Amino acid sequence: MTSLQPPGAGDLPPVRHVPDAAAHIRGYLRRTGRRLAVLDDDPTGSQAVHGVSVLTAPHPSGYANGLASPGDTCFVLTNSRSLDRAGAVAAHQAAARDLYTWEVGSGGTVEIVSRGDSTLRGHVTAEVDAVAAQRLASTGVATDGVLFCPAMLEAGRFTVGDTHFAVVDGVPTPVADTEFARDRTFGYTRSNLREFLAEQSGGAITAAEVASLSHDDIRTGGPQRVAEVLASLTHRRWVVVNAADHADLAVVALGLQLAQEAGRRFLV
């Protein structure tokens, strides 16, 4: 698919294609004994993937099957987008508690992904905070950084210059200027993702403290530069992932794995 780019953005660095990136990513997961548990706030997430297990409700008995082997991925449907903030926090906290309890007992590593809406509707920061707090309580492991990556390229949602866009009627449009931002429950006014996180968190996160993985970092610097940016994160600091091509996501995943190998811990 063609890389996405908003009008007037200027020339982005050329897309960086890493040979056999997918194989390297999968190989790392198997080699390090990692499993991916995706807490999905809406059933549409699991409908866009294949080759993974899906639990229609969080339950400890399902994890042994869904995460049986290193490299396995399991979607866990929390349906928390339909809940109020307190209910969403409770749902993610309970799922994370069971997953980290399973991790401790299995001897493997579970990497939890909080899967939300590519148009930014949902309990974004509250759910991640709940997972990070539960990880610390269950395993004693603190979260160094949180990667915020709402791109869904197949649907025309992408991020350039820290601003998130949705293609509407063929035109890339800042998401705050779309109908999605006028949602009665999850409305927002900011397209810049640093500013969005500040708005969505009620000021608990400031735009200035949010880091960024720019297209220059990703496409010019490659996985090593991505790892350097991620290694600088501490105390659960958020970082915006700029992505307009699947190759951008592959480079970020490879850089994330380099940072993990150096002992850093993240949520996505």
Which stretches of residues belong to each language-model region?
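Long, low-complexity, Lys/Arg-enriched
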Residues: 1-2, 53, 58, 82-84, ...
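Active-site-proximal helix-loop elements at catalytic-domain edges
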Residues: 1-15, 70-73, 79-86, 268
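N-terminal basic/disordered segments at the start of proteins
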Residues: 6-70
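Cap/lid and interdomain-hinge subdomains that line or gate substrate/regulatory clefts
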Residues: 26-40, 70-72, 82-112, 116-249
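N-terminal low-complexity or amphipathic/hydrophobic leaders
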Residues: 38-40, 44-45, 254-255, 266-268
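Short, glycine/acidic-enriched capping/hinge loops at junctions between secondary-structure elements
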Residues: 47-52, 65-66, 85-89, 160, ...
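A short, acidic, amphipathic alpha-helical segment used as a generic capping/interface helix at domain edges
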Residues: 57-67, 220-232, 253-258
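Long, internal scaffold/assembly segments composed of regular secondary structure
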Residues: 245-267
